[in-house]
Regions:
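A detector for small-residue-rich transmembrane helices and their helix-helix packing motifs
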Residues: 1-163
């Protein structure tokens, strides 16, 4: 609630890094969506994180690029990732500054991708099935933002009103 006692809806205007991340994610989504509608899955196959390709064919860019690729068969994944990025990322970027925010975003996102790939090497049956599965989306980085936001802003109440 602002100092004047009014109601705040959302975190306010997007900050520079959040805006750039949202625009990039949405642009990549629409390109992959259009490609997928014409039967071309190359974008997801080349930019998504598939541990098998990472380890066997050295697709070393994928722990970074998977953050920008979302499921091209529907809008929900990218929509809610970008909503969370806006809701929580704006406050973090304002608090930390653009450079520190981007560093945190990519460390948590790339870190989540690397952990996912390493877990796929474990001998357990459920983990081994992850070896040939492609991971896409900014969810790892978004969970990192949620953690950072919860640590820095432990008391605020978040109201979800979709009607």
């Amino acid at each position: 609630m602002p100092a004047g006692g009014g109601v705040v809806i959302g975190p306010g205007p997007m900050t520079p890094a959040v805006r750039a991340l949202v625009y990039t994610n949405v642009a990549v989504f629409f390109v992959s969506f259009i490609a997928a509608m014409s039967g071309n899955e190359t974008i997801v196959a080349v930019l998504g994180l598939k541990p098998q390709l990472l380890f066997e064919q050295l697709y070393v860019w994928t722990p970074f690029t998977y953050l920008f690729v979302h499921d091209p068969t529907g809008f929900g994944h990218v929509l809610f990732n970008m909503l969370a990025l806006w809701m929580f990322g704006v406050d973090l970027e304002r608090r930390w500054g653009t450079r520190a925010f981007l560093r945190y975003y990519f460390v948590t996102g790339v870190g989540a991708g690397i952990i996912t790939a390493l877990l796929s090497l474990l001998p357990f049956a459920a983990m081994r099935s992850m070896y040939a599965v492609t991971t896409v989306g900014a969810s790892g980085a978004i969970y990192g933002l949620l953690l950072g936001w919860a640590v820095l802003f432990p008391a605020p109440q978040i109201l979800f009103m979709f009607i």
